[in-house]
């Protein structure tokens, strides 16, 4: 197997805990992960606030350095890349942040955010090339270029702004896009279109995606593999269909049971999905399962050591002693059980993007009628 | 033309209604002109009913919440219409009369309400302040028991009364806000996106709490938000807002099973589920119209796949096309 594009090796990140500060927060604990660029994949990272999912994204982007372990780009440590490698890294790995309002400078027209990467990376030699690149990228995400170019950020909806960020990433033809809660600040009716545009980048341009979210429903819709985090530790990972439909780890069961499904006939169990916490289990050791205090199945062993990864099914692992009959698998091998790691070539499915293309047509009509209203 | 349709618009007639909103108009007067945030809204709330209002941002749903409490601040103004609460028109009350109604008869659990707690006051003091404001003698014996009861009703320990807000988690603070909202047993509780800042497990806890206290009290609830899943699981009836108007009202099962308005249909169709993987991710194409210059005729005609010629000029009226299922769309006019 070739060198992975991005690899995290036994990464731990703690905050605080300086010389005079006794309080130390473990944001992410001993986590390993690989992304192989030759096999475009869509992986979701799911967890509640404080689960470490954004810390992981920032580690993979090189925005923070790990406390222990290392993050590698093409086999080289991200902390001491040569300037050439660094530039290539900034091109290969793109990010889309949560807030489509904050990333734009309100004084510049939309064109600025698209021109900057073209200029910085010398993507176009002529003016025509520049225009073609921008038009192609915008149309891929279902936006008519003439409708947004020359406008200011405040004139566009959150959904449009977020899709322009997707188009901006596409300009650079990256190998990996990390999308950190890209739709959580956007209206529900616009979410599907943004996720559709991200998915098209994966299917049509072979770009891998890491989709970070607290929303299991959209994670289920877009990804192949999922990783569920709880307080800085991996609780469960694997094939998204299996994990969501038949969760193993008690935390994942709680999470799935808490989702209000948009169907009045479906139950909404919340905590009733798993039951009440087991209660006192005695002295808590140095290592323990983070979910113990909320877990109805907790046993004395759960507070004495932290559970390893159990390889429960072909495409999934769970970090819970309930599955101690299953063989264990080292953290560093975790991604080998992913569906994307065991597939040859691109994803085979029949996801259609005609909705995005239809958007191009509808927006012409609405823009013409909107301008007639302005008179 | 528009004025004419508004005045002839049918109102949902409810005799046993706790709250009845009739032809409500709320405009924000800006330098560029009047923004018609709420443009002729009618609905009624039965006793003990849970009613949902959904819509995208800027559809006017939060403006409705604030105008029911008469908390609209300039440049916003209630331009017309009535809000009957237990038979009294709130719009015509004086400021002082309205102040007494708030919390006592109609209470609000706001979006991010947990940030509305005073950070330097103990939880007990925040209750005391509310009681004092409504002329309740806080020195009388038993007041601490009452606060303790309120806290335990929302599933918190009585000791929480002596804590400061920063000692509580987001979900606990939101439950304190629910306890505050029910402290004077109001007949209507307005919950404006009460869980939008919370994680899904905590969201369930908060909504479960709200449902329990609402049922105990026999109060009606208006839940405002854009999470269709939350609506499906919590409300009895649902109203869909679009560009300042209510375009559809139905029982929650009918709304999800058989939406009538094209906007409602697209909204339901765009919902991701955990059952099947959709082979196309489709949102609602186009953008929300500006409320400064709303489109003529039906506000949805610029995005509607079933648009007809007269949709551009004639504003459809909300009417009952099936039992308990109201829709404002020209498609259903012949059906009636």
Predicted regions span which residues?
Chain A
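Conserved ABC transporter NBD signature motif
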Residues: 37, 69-77
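Short catalytic/signature loops enriched in Gly
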Residues: 4, 239-356
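A short, proline-enriched helix->beta-strand linker immediately N-terminal to the Walker B motif
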Residues: 171-175
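Conserved ABC ATPase signature
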Residues: 152-156, 160
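P-loop NTP-binding/switch modules centered on Walker-like glycine-rich loops
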Residues: 186, 190-268
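ABC ATPase NBD coupling module
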Residues: 20-22, 78-94, 112, 120, ...
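Helix-to-loop junction immediately C-terminal to a conserved catalytic motif
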Residues: 61
């Amino acid at each position: 197997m070739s060198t992975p594009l991005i690899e995290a090796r036994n990464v731990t990140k703690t905050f605080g805990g300086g010389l005079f500060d006794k309080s130390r927060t473990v944001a992410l604990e001993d986590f390993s992960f690989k992304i192989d660029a030759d096999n475009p994949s869509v992986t979701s990272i799911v967890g509640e606030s404080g689960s470490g999912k954004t810390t992981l994204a920032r580690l993979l982007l090189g925005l923070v350095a790990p406390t222990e372990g290392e993050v590698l780009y093409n086999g080289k440590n991200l902390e001491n890349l040569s300037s050439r490698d660094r530039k290539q890294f900034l091109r290969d790995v793109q990010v889309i942040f949560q807030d489509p309002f904050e990333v734009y400078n309100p004084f510049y027209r939309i064109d600025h955010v698209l021109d900057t990467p073209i200029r910085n990376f010398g993507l176009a030699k002529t003016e025509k090339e520049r225009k073609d690149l921008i038009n192609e990228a915008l149309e891929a995400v279902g936006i008519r270029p003439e409708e947004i170019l020359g406008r200011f950020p405040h004139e566009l909806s959150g959904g449009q702004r977020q899709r322009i960020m997707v188009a901006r990433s596409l300009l650079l033809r990256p190998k990996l896009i990390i999308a950190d809660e890209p739709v959580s600040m956007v209206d529900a009716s616009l979410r599907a279109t943004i996720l559709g545009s991200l998915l098209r980048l994966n299917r049509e341009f072979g770009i891998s995606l890491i989709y970070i979210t607290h929303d299991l429903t959209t994670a289920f819709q877009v990804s192949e593999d999922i990783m569920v985090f709880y307080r800085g530790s991996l609780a469960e990972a694997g094939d998204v269909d299996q994990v969501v439909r038949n969760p193993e780890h008690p935390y994942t069961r709680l999470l799935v049971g808490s989702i209000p499904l948009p169907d009045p006939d479906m139950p909404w169990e919340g905590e009733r999905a798993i039951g009440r916490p087991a209660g006192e289990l005695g002295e808590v050791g140095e290592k323990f399962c983070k979910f113990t205090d909320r877990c109805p199945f907790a046993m004395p062993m759960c507070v004495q050591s932290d559970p390893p990864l159990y390889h429960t099914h072909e495409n999934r692992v769970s970090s819970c002693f309930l599955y101690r009959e299953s063989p264990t698998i080292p953290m560093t091998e975790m991604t080998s059980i992913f569906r994307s790691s065991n597939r040859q070539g691109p994803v085979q499915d029949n996801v259609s993007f005609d909705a995005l293309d239809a958007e191009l047509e509808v927006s012409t009509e609405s823009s013409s009628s909107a301008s007639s209203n302005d008179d | 033309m528009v004025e004419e349709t508004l005045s002839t618009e049918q109102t949902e007639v409810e005799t046993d209604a706790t709250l009845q909103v009739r032809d409500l108009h709320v405009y924000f007067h800006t330098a560029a002109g009047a923004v018609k945030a709420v443009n002729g809204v009618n609905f009624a709330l039965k006793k003990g009913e849970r009613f949902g209002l959904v819509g995208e941002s800027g559809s006017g749903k939060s403006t409705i919440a604030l105008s029911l409490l008469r908390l609209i601040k300039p440049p916003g103004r209630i331009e017309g219409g009535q809000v009957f609460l237990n038979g009294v028109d709130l719009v015509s009350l004086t400021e002082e009369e309205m102040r007494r109604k708030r919390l006592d008869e109609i209470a609000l659990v706001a979006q991010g309400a947990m940030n509305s707690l005073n950070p330097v006051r103990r939880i007990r003091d925040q209750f005391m302040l509310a009681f004092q404001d409504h002329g309740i003698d806080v020195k009388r014996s038993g007041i601490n028991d009452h606060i303790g009861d309120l806290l335990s009703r929302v599933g918190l320990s009585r000791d929480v009364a002596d804590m400061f807000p920063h000692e509580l988690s987001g979900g606990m603070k939101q439950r304190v806000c629910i306890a505050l909202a029910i402290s004077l047993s109001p007949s209507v509780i307005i919950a404006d996106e009460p869980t939008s800042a919370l994680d899904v497990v905590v969201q369930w806890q908060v909504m479960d709490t709200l449902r329990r206290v609402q049922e105990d009290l026999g109060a009606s609830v208006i839940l405002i938000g854009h999470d269709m899943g939350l609506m499906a699981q919590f409300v009895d009836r649902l109203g869909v807002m679009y560009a300042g108007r209510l375009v559809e009202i139905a029982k929650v099962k009918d709304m999800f099973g058989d939406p009538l308005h094209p906007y409602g249909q697209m909204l339901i169709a765009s919902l991701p589920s955990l059952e099947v993987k959709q082979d196309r991710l489709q949102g609602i194409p186009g953008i929300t119209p500006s409320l400064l210059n709303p489109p003529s005729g039906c506000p949805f005609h610029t995005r509607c796949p079933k648009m007809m010629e007269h949709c551009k000029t004639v504003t459809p009226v909300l009417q009952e096309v099936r039992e308990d299922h109201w829709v404002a769309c020209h498609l259903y006019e012949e059906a009636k």
